[in-house]
Amino acid sequence: MKNVDNYRRGYFMPPVKSLKWAEKEYITTPPTWCSVDLRDGNQALVVPMSLEEKLEYYHMLLKIGFKEIEVGFPAASETEYAFLRTLIEQNLIPEDVTIQVLTQSRDHIIEKTFKALVGVKKAVVHLYNSTSVAQREQVFKMSREEIVEIAVSGARLLKKYAAETEGNFQFEYSPESFTGTEMEFALEICNQVLDVFEPTPENKVIINLPATVSLSMPHVYASQIEYMSEHLKYRDNVILSLHPHNDRGTAVADAELGLLAGGQRIEGTLFGNGERTGNVDIVTLALNLFSHGVDPGLNFASMLEITAKYEALTRMKVHDRQPYGGKLVFAAFSGSHQDAITKGIKWREEHECHYWNVPYLLIDPQDIGREYEGDVIRINSQSGKGGIAYMLEQHYALDLPAKMREAFGYKVKNVSDNLHKELMPEEIKDIFFKEYVNIENPIKFLNFHFLNHDDFQTTVTLEFKGEIQELSGEGDGRLDAISNALQARLGLSYSNLIYKEHALELGSKSQAVSYVGVTGPDGVIHWGCGIHTDIFTSSVKALISAINTMIKDSAAV
């Protein structure tokens, strides 16, 4: 590409690296989760949420289980201020939930922030100022010392107004644009702020290290976090928080490695909504933990409901391939994938396996409110016999013989290919019935009669080419007798009769279904299916359907 020489790495490695985080295999305990949907997420919407919409979103966050929720920047707008006052005055903050508010390091802004907090029982007050080289040089045109003074003076003001306001206030500080800041300077400014706050075991301070713009690979961010974690003053009384953005598409990886490196808290949003490419997706982070057997402490058991409400309130779209939340994240169109999933699910049922280990499915879709039938097995021109048969069995209790599955699979794939679309279960059933079930052309079955139960001699009444005919025959069994009568009198030739039957339990419990395959002179197996309240009548209808299919297929050649 052109202009590649215009770019360089804009991050700063820590002066020392221990890389202890790299020795850890996985995250063993969940972080403290702080939703910033109502501030970081909301400000990034084309149409920000109204107060009523924010209230509905807030209640959804509570239902999911968030215990820390950033509710806004009350000094930034009247809507943000009014929303905070509504939560406080209507007593909408549960005892075990802490709200968080954002403020810049300016006296009148901090004063208005605490005015908005009057009456709250507890809250996190989040102070931030930009520290990166680019911000210092281009935006603020200030030295390091001047940037430190902004942070320190803001910290002093927080302490002052907190002392004058009733309530329990926890302080948070963010060196905004941390990833573009020299690590020694980021450490210096955080430690000077901590000296003002003087954290204690009873009143810990949150130091939040945002990847305001993601500038590096995740392992670099992890090394930066580890350096800060190992060198911050008052470390036992500091909660180290992470706030990754997704500019390089690595926010989840940044967060996960950052947690291994000493992070204890995550600020993020549902489905990664946020400025530019978004914040880290808490849904993905939480359910990644879940997939490793670690309880994330958040409840996404009703994922479809959460997704629908998110889309309605934010007017954003959850991508079909968005991890865990997208419509197609569990969908298998590929034949080999469908076959493996179907066999894996059946294996679990037969073995009563405790641990989830189904091929191609990271977690059990049912754990987040999804279904195997509609969400996992999907049918298009790439689908295989296993997935197609699975749909018929799950939706309509039709358990096709193995070889019939293959033949029917080709028919379904051809239809999907010609229509250029995915096929729904009802469409698949319609194809099956049209091709195989109770076929009456050119031979229409009318009746049969056996002389007695022990002697397999039969008379079959049918309509063939517009004429009513009675055919007689005998054989080793009742279906064999009817088959022999048909072959002898109608001049038909086939062999290797395949037969399977079972009760049709879904919909009509009194009905039975039979499947019959016959091998024609061309060596091809032709299939038919019969459905009737009498099990033997269903088998006769299946046989005649198979013969009709053979005649039709032969005529088409």
From Swiss-Prot:
Cell location: Cytoplasm
Top EC group: transferase
Pathway noted in the entry: Amino-acid biosynthesis; L-leucine biosynthesis; L-leucine from 3-methyl-2-oxobutanoate: step 1/4
Coiled-coil segments: none
GO biological process terms held by the UniProt record: L-leucine biosynthetic process
Chain ranges of the Pyruvate carboxyltransferase domain: 31-304
GO cellular component: cytoplasm
Keyword check for Isomerase: no
Residues where Mg(2+) binds: 40, 243, 245, 279
GO MF assignments: 2-isopropylmalate synthase activity; acetyl-CoA C-acetyltransferase activity; magnesium ion binding
Reaction equation(s) it catalyzes: 3-methyl-2-oxobutanoate + acetyl-CoA + H2O = (2S)-2-isopropylmalate + CoA + H(+)
Assembly, per entry: Homodimer.
Biological function: Catalyzes the condensation of the acetyl group of acetyl-CoA with 3-methyl-2-oxobutanoate (2-ketoisovalerate) to form 3-carboxy-3-hydroxy-4-methylpentanoate (2-isopropylmalate).
Protein name: 2-isopropylmalate synthase
Organism per entry: Desulfitobacterium hafniense (strain Y51)
Lineage: Bacteria, Bacillati, Bacillota, Clostridia, Eubacteriales
Gene: leuA
